[in-house]
Amino acid sequence: MQFAVKLTARQQQILDLIQSAIARTGAPPTRAEIANELGFKSANAAEEHLQALARKGVIELVSGTSRGIRLKGDALRSLNESRHREGGQFSLSLPGMSQLALPLIGRVAAGSPILAQEHVDQTYYVENTLFQRQPDYLLKVRGMSMRDAGIMDGDLLAVQATKEARNGQIVVARLGDEVTVKRLKRNKQVIELHAENPDYPTIVVQPGEPFEIEGLAVGLIRNTMLM
């Protein structure tokens, strides 16, 4: 995308890095991360380039935080439009990094497998080092029931497909025809699915009721810059 202001090659490189980091994690990189990625000897060199980008109006620097970088104007619009450029494929990785291709699951139809092709909205490409445990798919979060666990409406939950989970882990569970994200707690007689928001009740699964674990939450991609 052509910007209204002229950037040097190095400034464009740093701007691309900021956009990629925000798309990948929901947060901009630190000065140290920029310096390390681009081979600067110190974070001060990164700061000088950031100040130049701020003067040109493509970013805003926020004092008091190591990740205080906000995209503005054309730079922000360019990031928001990037998800539509390749026919449903959206890259959340930096150039040169090994990638995982993860299907994004939207709404799940009643009674059908969660990874059925009709549920796949698009494919995201992410760095294979982004998550400690490798996910099999991304699930778009709907609602605020897991708010206090930091999982917000519109976030992309990275899920490892499994039928097993331990007490206290956050799982994707199927209850009859519904799929939900909750914290698992097994008691002697019942299974409890706990929300992380006091406005939402605990779901109690009685013996004999339809219940199945579909996957385990292994990471999160913020919705901040994916709208």
From Swiss-Prot:
What is one GO biological process annotated to this record?
negative regulation of DNA-templated transcription
Q: Write down the InterPro entries for this protein, in alphabetical order.
A: LexA, LexA-like, LexA/Signal_pep-like_sf, LexA_DNA-bd_dom, LexA_repressor, Peptidase_S24_LexA, Peptidase_S24_S26A/B/C, WH-like_DNA-bd_sf
Which residues constitute the catalytic centre? S145, K182
What's this protein's family per the entry? Belongs to the peptidase S24 family.
**Record keywords, A-Z:** Autocatalytic cleavage, DNA damage, DNA repair, DNA replication, DNA-binding, Hydrolase, Repressor, SOS response, Transcription, Transcription regulation
**SUPFAM superfamilies with a match to the protein in the record:** LexA/Signal peptidase, Winged helix' DNA-binding domain
Q: What is this protein called?
A: LexA repressor
Q: What is its EC number?
A: 3.4.21.88
Q: What does this protein do?
A: Represses a number of genes involved in the response to DNA damage (SOS response), including recA and lexA. In the presence of single-stranded DNA, RecA interacts with LexA causing an autocatalytic cleavage which disrupts the DNA-binding part of LexA, leading to derepression of the SOS regulon and eventually DNA repair.
Matches recorded under NCBIfam families: lexA (TIGR00498)
GO MF terms held by the record = DNA binding; serine-type endopeptidase activity
Site residues by UniProt (Cleavage):
A110, G111
On subunit structure and binding partners, the annotation says: Homodimer.
EC class (word)? hydrolase
DNA-binding region listed in the record = 31-51
* Reaction(s) the record says it catalyses: Hydrolysis of Ala-|-Gly bond in repressor LexA
Q: Which organism is this entry from?
A: Variovorax paradoxus (strain S110)
